[in-house]
């Protein structure tokens, strides 16, 4: 959407993608030529994802030589999925079974803002500009895994989860001047400052026999 109201030029846009849930089933069966050997596997999955974007901006013409503008934008992308699998294996008439449940959730967000000032210096198109930008990005991911192994005389459970997050901030200021001397000849000077901050952290935990979550420092 674009609009002109007096000295204001306005623009905005919104978009989104919402996909149907992705569900599926996979089955595998292997036949052996010998008695007492078998392999059967089944998997189920269910995934949901979405994407959204919004942007709005404005430019104000102070006079014929000076103008200021600003724009902000937000983006979100997320997915959430579960899966289940079971495998039955018989080797030399000795049965073994494994069952797994998995959950994964991811979220990604971006916010950006821009402010600028422009001044036309002469009729040749010489211009003085000041532009300031800020971008914030944040992503998170969570996983939960439950696995069970079974044989004829024993069984074992494994449960673990993880959380990962990343934060990223960047701010820039750009000041420039372009002097058009004559056709196809110009002089450009300027300065730019950039500030960056990054924070990445993750946590991996396993569930012990008493029901407590124990951090795994080797992966964290």
Task: Give, region by region, the residue ranges found by the protein language model.
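Membrane-proximal, glycine/serine-rich, low-complexity loop/turn segments characteristic
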Residues: 1-84, 102-140, 171, 176-196
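Outer-membrane beta-barrel transmembrane domain signature of Gram-negative proteins
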Residues: 160-220
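Outer-membrane beta-barrel translocator domains and adjoining extracellular loop/strand segments
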Residues: 23-36, 81-96, 140-149, 154, ...
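Short linear motifs at secondary-structure transitions and domain/linker junctions
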Residues: 43-45, 91, 104-108, 151-153, ...
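Extracellular loop and loop/strand-boundary signature of outer-membrane beta-barrel proteins
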Residues: 39-44, 96-103, 157-163, 211-220
């Amino acid at each position: 959407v674009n609009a002109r109201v007096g000295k204001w030029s306005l623009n905005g846009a919104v978009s989104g993608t919402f996909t149907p849930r992705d569900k599926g089933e996979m089955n595998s069966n292997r036949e052996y030529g010998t008695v007492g050997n078998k392999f059967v596997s089944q998997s189920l999955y269910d995934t949901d994802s979405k994407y959204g974007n919004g942007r709005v901006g404005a430019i104000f013409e102070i006079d014929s030589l000076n103008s200021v503008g600003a724009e902000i934008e937000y983006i979100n992308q997320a997915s959430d999925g579960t899966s289940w699998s079971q495998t039955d294996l018989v080797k030399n008439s000795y049965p073994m079974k494994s069952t797994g449940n998995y959950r994964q959730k991811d979220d990604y967000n971006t916010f950006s803002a821009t402010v600028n000032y422009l001044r036309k210096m002469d009729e040749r198109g010489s211009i003085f500009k000041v532009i300031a930008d800020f971008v914030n990005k944040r992503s998170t991911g969570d996983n939960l895994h439950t696995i069970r192994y079974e044989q004829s005389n024993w069984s074992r459970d494994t449960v673990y989860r993880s959380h990962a997050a990343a934060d990223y901030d960047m701010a820039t200021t750009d000041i420039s001047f372009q002097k058009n001397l004559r056709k196809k000849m110009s002089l450009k000077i300027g300065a730019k400052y950039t500030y960056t901050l990054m924070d990445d952290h993750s946590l991996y935990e396993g569930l012990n026999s008493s029901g407590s979550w124990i951090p795994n420092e080797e992966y964290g």
